């Protein structure tokens, strides 16, 4: 980011930071922690990954979070301001056929073995059948908290990919989601390309199985744990209710990707629903995809995340 603290946070993030009493603190930290270019350790980090999570908007204006896969090296950072993804493997999620030059995207690199994660937000400057080039507008890291350590292995069923669309929850889907310990959420703050603090973001959410639950109206409830006080996701939801949610079936190779509308519930207003948490995100399903055998690799849990 630029050195101007006014350019670091958008109005939604500033609203949430004010409500939680961290405005002054984050005004000083923001320009130091959120950069407009990738430091060399982040550039090296992305080149080691076999997967990256992408948040983006489809042609109808819905947000999605979806994974891209390849052998380590399929992601490169030719400079501090450019991230290049070579599409060496099929991209079964429909989002990727709809991303174009100037599409805003959020990227999350996560290394389950080390529990490291780094993020890049920006926009596509070149798109071919085999490659996506992204101009970096925001680059920052996150702590390892709530990331489950996992070890990668080959998925022998990966060739048998099939897709099913759903618009309602069934028992099987509810069971998968309520037993998940990890999900990824895409959110957005609309704006022009010149505004570095606007665009799409994708973040990791983790917890013990059962940390995501359903209410009586079959809406998803995701707690917002105390963190770095950036409030990227919560701040986005203050100004734009669209979200994309992704669940990876680490042991069987399937993915569940859905688009939804969301609202932020605050404990002071909804003490029963929020329980011990200061905030909860409540999501109403629009539509989703089950993509079976989409993961070319499986991940075996190594131990519980702190």
Predicted regions and their residues:
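Binding-site signature for planar aromatic cofactors or substrates
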Residues: 1-306
């Amino acid at each position: 980011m630029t050195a101007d603290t006014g350019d670091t946070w958008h109005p939604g993030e500033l609203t949430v930071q004010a409500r939680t009493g961290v405005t002054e603190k984050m005004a000083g930290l923001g320009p130091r922690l959120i950069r407009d270019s990738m430091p060399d350790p982040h550039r090296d980090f992305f080149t080691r990954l076999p997967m990256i999570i992408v948040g983006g908007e489809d042609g109808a204006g819905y947000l999605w979070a979806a994974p891209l896969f390849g052998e380590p090296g399929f992601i490169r950072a030719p400079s501090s301001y450019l991230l290049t993804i070579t599409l060496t493997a099929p991209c079964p999620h429909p989002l990727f056929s709809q991303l174009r030059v100037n599409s805003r995207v959020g990227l999350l690199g996560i290394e389950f073995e080390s529990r490291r994660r780094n993020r890049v937000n920006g926009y596509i400057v070149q798109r071919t059948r085999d490659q996506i080039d992204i101009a970096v507008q925001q680059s920052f890291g996150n702590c390892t908290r709530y990331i489950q350590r996992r070890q990668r292995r080959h998925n022998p069923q990966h060739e048998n990919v099939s897709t099913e669309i759903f618009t309602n929850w069934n028992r099987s889907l509810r069971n998968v989601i309520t037993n998940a310990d990890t999900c990824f959420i895409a959110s957005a703050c609309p704006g022009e390309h010149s505004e570095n603090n606007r665009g799409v973001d994708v973040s990791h959410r983790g917890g013990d199985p059962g940390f995501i639950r359903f209410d009586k109206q079959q809406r998803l409830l995701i707690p917002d744990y105390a963190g770095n006080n950036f409030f990227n996701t919560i701040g986005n939801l203050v100004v734009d209710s669209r979200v994309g949610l992704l669940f990876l079936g680490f042991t069987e190779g399937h993915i569940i990707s859905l688009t939804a509308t969301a609202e932020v519930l605050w404990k002071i207003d909804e003490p029963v629903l929020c329980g011990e948490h200061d905030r909860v995100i409540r999501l109403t399903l629009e539509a989703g995809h089950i993509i079976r055998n989409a993961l070319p690799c499986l991940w075996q849990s190594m131990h519980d995340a702190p």
